C-alpha cells in the first residue's frame, strides 16, 4: 500500500476536496494533534512562477491574521519540495458542511428570515476583517460555508487581494477575480476598492439567496459587469412576494452604484438586518426613499463613468481554467465525486482555449473603453473634482492620480480640520474640469492657538461657557469638597497655556461631601443593631450596657449616640446603648459589730450613706444592735440607699439588743426582727 504524502512531517494528505485557479485543497490528518484539517497547496504547474509563489504567501499572511468564529481558521503554513521546486501550503480548519453555492444549486428555497440570519454571519466576518485592513474582494456563494449546525464560515480571505495585483481581467463569468455576478461597479471599472465593495458583493449574494437568481445575468462577463455599472437591479420582491419592503430596502441600499451612498460598514448593514428581523424600522428604508425621490441615489444618464482598465503592475495575462459551477459541499471550488467527468483534451484544444481567452480579453478592454464611457463613445476628457476636504495629503494625492488630476498644496492654519488634513480646495467639489487640470489644496497646520482662561473658583456653568466661547472642548471630573457644589477646584492644562481650538480642557468640579445617616435601631438586639449600622460600610458601631428597671428594655437597644437620622461623616462611630437588668444588693449583717467595723463592712458592699440613729452613741467603739433596712434586705442601688444604725455604748449593756438578739426598740419603726 502506498504511503500517504506527508507535509511538514505531520500532515498526511487524503483525497482532493477541490481545485481552483491556483491551488488544490486536500482533506488531511494532523498526526501531531490528531485532528482533521484542510491543506491548500499551490498547483505544481504554477509553483515555478515566482509571482504565484508570492501571491500564495500573501494569501497565507492575510488569512493567518484573522481569528474569528465566522472565518475559516488558518492553523499553519509551510513549504514542500517536489523535484527541487518549493510548493507552499496552508493548513486550515476543516469545515464539515456545504457551500451556499451548493445550497442554491440544490433547489431548496430558504425562508427570507433564515437568509438574513446567514447574511449576518457573513457581515460579522467582514466587519472583523475590515477592521484588520483586509478586503475580501470575492464574496460569493462558493466562498461561504454553512456547517451542519448552521454556522456561517467565510473562507478564501486574501486570495482576491493576492491575485488582484496581476494583469488578469474577466475571461469567463466563473473564472474571474471577483466573479462577475458579484462584482462591484468599482471593480468592474478597474478602480480602487475598499470595504464597501465587499458590502456590494454581499448585497448580490443576499439578493440571490432571497430570489434564487443573481441581480444581473448576461451572456458574458462583460455584459454582466456592464449591468453592475449602468443598470439598476429590480427589487427582490418582484420575484418573491414574501420579501418585505424592509428587505428590499436593505438589498437595494447594498447595491447602490456609488460607494458613498452604499452601506459604509458591515456593522451598519448588520444592524439594519437585525432591526428587520426584530420587526423594527430599518435605516435603509429612508435612504432608498430619498433615492426614489431623486436624491443622492439618482444616476443621471449623462453621468460620466470610468473606462475599464487593466492593472499594469503585473506580468503577462494568464488564462485560468473556469471554475465548475458545482463546487461541491465543502466550500473549496469543487468536490471530486461531484465533478463532471470530462474527456482529456489534446494540446490543440488548449491552444484554441488560450487564443479564445486572448480574444475575449481584448474584447473586454475595448468594450470597457467604449461601453463604460459616459456617452457610449470615446472616453470623456472631463472629470468631476472629488471632495478632497477632510482627506490626508496622501489620500488626496491618490484620488487625484486615479482620475489624472494635478494637485498643488499650501499650508495654513484651519479651525475646522486637524493638522495634516485638507481644509480647502479650488475648484470646489463636483466642478467638471479637464484631465491634467490643477486643483489647489490647502493643508491644515492645525487650528490657531488660544490661551486657556483661568476658571478656577468659578461656577461650572460659567467656566464651561467661557472655555467653549474660546473654542475649547470641556471635560469634567467631580471631587468631594467642602467648597460649594459646582465650584471649579482645578483645571488642566493650567491657565495661560496656549492650545489649538478644539483642544480639551479638563475641569475638577466640587461636589458635596457625602454623609452617612444613623439608622433607627431602638428595640433591636445589639447584634442586629450593629449589623444594620455597619451595613452601608460607612459607619462603625459599638454596644454598651445601661441598667434599667424596665424588664421590656432588658437586652434591647434603648438609644444611640448620635441619635437616629443624624447626618454624620463616613467612618464615624455610633454608640449603641443596650438595657441591662439592675442587680440587687443585700444589706450585710453588722449587728454586734463596733460602729467602726459596721461602717467598713457596709461601705465595702456599696452602702456609703451610713447614719447613726438619733440618741445612739456615735463613737467608733459603740456596738451596733440594729439596722434599717434590716440585714438581708435587697436594694437596687446601695449607694443611694441610706443605712441607719442603732448603737449602745461600747462598754456593753446587758440588754439582748446588745448581743444582736434583742427585739425591736419601742418607738423606732423599722428596727426589730
Swiss-Prot record:
Which PROSITE patterns does the record associate with it?
A: PASTA, PROTEIN_KINASE_ATP, PROTEIN_KINASE_DOM, PROTEIN_KINASE_ST
Keyword tags: ATP-binding, Kinase, Nucleotide-binding, Repeat, Serine/threonine-protein kinase, Transferase
Q: Which reaction does it catalyse?
A: L-seryl-[protein] + ATP = O-phospho-L-seryl-[protein] + ADP + H(+); L-threonyl-[protein] + ATP = O-phospho-L-threonyl-[protein] + ADP + H(+)
What's the superkingdom here?
A: Bacteria
According to its UniProt record, which residues of this chain constitute the active site?
138
Q: Which molecular function GO terms apply here?
A: ATP binding; protein serine kinase activity; protein serine/threonine kinase activity
Compositional bias (Polar residues) at which positions?
479-493
Describe the location of the PASTA domain by residue ranges. 379-445, 446-511, 512-580, 581-649
Record-annotated Protein kinase domain positions: 11-277
What family does this chain come from, according to its entry? Belongs to the protein kinase superfamily. Ser/Thr protein kinase family.
Q: Please identify the protein, giving its name as recorded.
A: Probable serine/threonine-protein kinase SCO3848
User: Origin organism of this chain?
Assistant: Streptomyces coelicolor (strain ATCC BAA-471 / A3(2) / M145)
Amino acid at each position: 500500500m502506498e504511503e500517504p504524502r506527508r507535509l511538514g512531517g505531520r500532515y498526511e494528505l487524503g483525497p482532493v476536496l477541490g481545485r481552483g485557479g491556483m491551488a488544490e485543497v486536500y482533506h488531511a490528518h494532523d498526526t501531531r494533534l490528531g485532528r482533521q484539517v484542510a491543506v491548500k497547496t499551490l498547483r505544481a504547474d504554477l509553483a515555478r512562477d515566482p509571482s504565484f509563489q508570492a501571491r500564495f504567501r500573501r494569501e497565507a499572511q492575510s488569512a493567518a491574521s484573522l481569528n474569528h468564529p465566522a472565518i475559516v481558521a488558518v492553523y499553519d503554513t509551510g513549504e514542500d519540495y517536489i523535484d527541487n521546486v518549493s510548493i507552499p501550503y496552508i493548513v486550515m480548519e476543516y469545515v464539515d458542511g456545504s457551500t451556499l453555492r451548493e445550497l442554491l444549486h440544490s433547489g431548496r428555497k430558504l425562508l427570507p428570515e433564515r437568509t438574513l440570519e446567514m447574511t449576518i454571519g457573513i457581515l460579522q466576518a467582514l466587519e472583523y476583517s475590515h477592521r484588520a485592513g483586509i478586503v475580501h474582494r470575492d464574496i460569493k456563494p462558493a466562498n461561504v460555508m454553512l456547517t451542519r449546525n448552521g454556522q456561517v464560515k467565510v473562507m478564501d480571505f486574501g486570495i482576491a487581494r493576492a491575485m488582484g495585483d496581476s494583469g488578469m481581467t474577466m475571461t469567463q463569468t466563473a473564472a474571474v477575480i471577483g466573479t462577475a455576478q458579484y462584482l462591484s461597479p468599482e471593480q468592474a471599472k478597474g478602480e480602487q476598492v475598499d470595504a464597501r465593495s465587499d458590502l456590494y458583493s454581499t448585497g448580490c449574494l443576499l439578493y440571490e439567496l432571497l430570489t434564487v437568481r443573481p441581480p444581473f445575468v448576461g451572456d458574458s462577463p462583460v455584459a454582466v459587469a456592464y449591468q453592475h455599472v449602468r443598470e439598476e437591479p429590480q427589487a427582490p420582491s418582484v420575484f418573491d412576494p414574501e420579501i418585505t419592503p424592509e428587505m428590499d430596502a436593505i438589498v437595494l441600499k447594498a447595491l447602490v452604484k456609488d460607494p458613498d451612498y452604499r452601506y459604509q460598514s458591515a456593522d451598519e448593514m448588520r444592524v439594519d438586518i437585525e432591526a428587520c428581523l426584530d420587526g423594527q424600522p430599518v435605516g435603509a428604508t429612508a435612504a432608498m426613499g430619498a433615492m426614489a425621490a431623486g436624491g443622492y441615489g439618482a444616476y443621471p444618464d449623462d453621468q460620466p463613468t470610468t473606462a475599464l482598465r487593466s492593472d499594469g503592475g503585473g506580468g503577462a495575462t494568464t488564462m485560468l481554467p473556469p471554475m465548475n459551477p458545482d463546487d461541491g459541499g465543502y466550500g473549496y471550488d469543487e468536490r471530486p465525486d461531484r465533478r463532471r467527468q470530462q474527456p482529456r483534451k489534446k494540446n490543440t484544444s488548449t491552444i484554441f482555449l488560450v487564443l479564445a481567452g486572448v480574444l475575449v480579453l481584448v474584447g473586454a478592454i475595448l468594450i470597457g473603453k467604449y461601453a463604460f464611457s459616459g456617452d457610449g463613445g470615446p472616453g470623456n476628457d472631463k472629470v468631476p473634482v472629488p471632495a478632497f476636504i477632510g482627506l490626508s495629503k496622501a489620500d488626496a494625492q491618490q484620488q487625484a492620480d486615479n482620475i489624472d488630476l494635478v494637485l498643488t498644496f499650501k499650508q495654513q492654519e484651519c479651525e475646522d480640520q486637524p493638522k495634516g488634513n485638507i481644509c480647502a480646495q479650488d475648484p470646489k467639489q463636483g466642478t467638471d474640469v479637464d484631465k491634467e487640470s490643477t486643483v489647489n489644496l490647502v493643508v491644515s497646520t492645525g487650528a490657531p492657538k488660544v490661551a486657556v482662561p483661568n476658571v478656577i473658583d468659578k461656577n461650572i456653568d460659567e467656566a464651561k461657557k467661557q472655555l467653549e466661547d474660546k473654542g475649547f472642548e470641556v471635560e469634567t471630573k467631580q471631587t468631594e469638597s467642602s467648597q460649594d457644589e459646582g465650584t471649579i477646584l482645578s483645571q488642566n492644562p493650567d491657565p495661560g497655556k496656549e492650545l489649538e481650538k478644539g483642544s480639551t480642557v479638563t475641569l475638577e468640579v466640587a461636589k458635596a461631601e457625602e454623609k452617612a445617616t444613623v439608622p433607627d435601631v431602638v428595640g433591636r438586639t445589639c447584634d442586629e443593631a450593629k449589623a444594620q449600622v455597619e451595613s452601608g460600610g460607612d459607619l462603625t458601631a459599638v454596644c454598651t450596657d445601661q441598667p434599667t428597671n424596665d424588664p421590656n428594655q432588658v437586652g434591647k437597644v434603648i438609644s444611640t449616640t448620635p441619635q437616629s437620622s443624624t447626618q454624620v461623616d463616613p467612618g464615624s462611630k455610633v454608640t449603641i446603648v443596650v438595657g441591662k437588668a439592675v442587680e440587687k444588693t443585700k444589706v450585710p449583717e453588722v449587728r454586734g459589730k463596733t460602729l467602726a467595723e459596721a461602717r467598713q463592712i457596709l461601705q465595702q458592699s456599696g452602702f456609703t450613706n451610713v447614719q447613726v440613729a438619733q440618741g445612739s452613741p456615735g463613737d467608733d467603739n459603740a456596738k451596733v444592735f440594729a439596722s434599717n433596712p434590716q440585714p438581708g434586705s435587697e436594694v437596687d442601688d446601695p449607694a443611694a440607699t441610706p443605712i441607719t444604725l442603732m448603737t449602745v455604748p461600747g462598754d456593753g449593756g446587758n440588754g439582748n439588743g446588745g448581743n444582736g438578739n434583742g427585739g425591736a426598740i419601742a418607738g423606732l419603726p423599722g428596727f426589730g426582727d
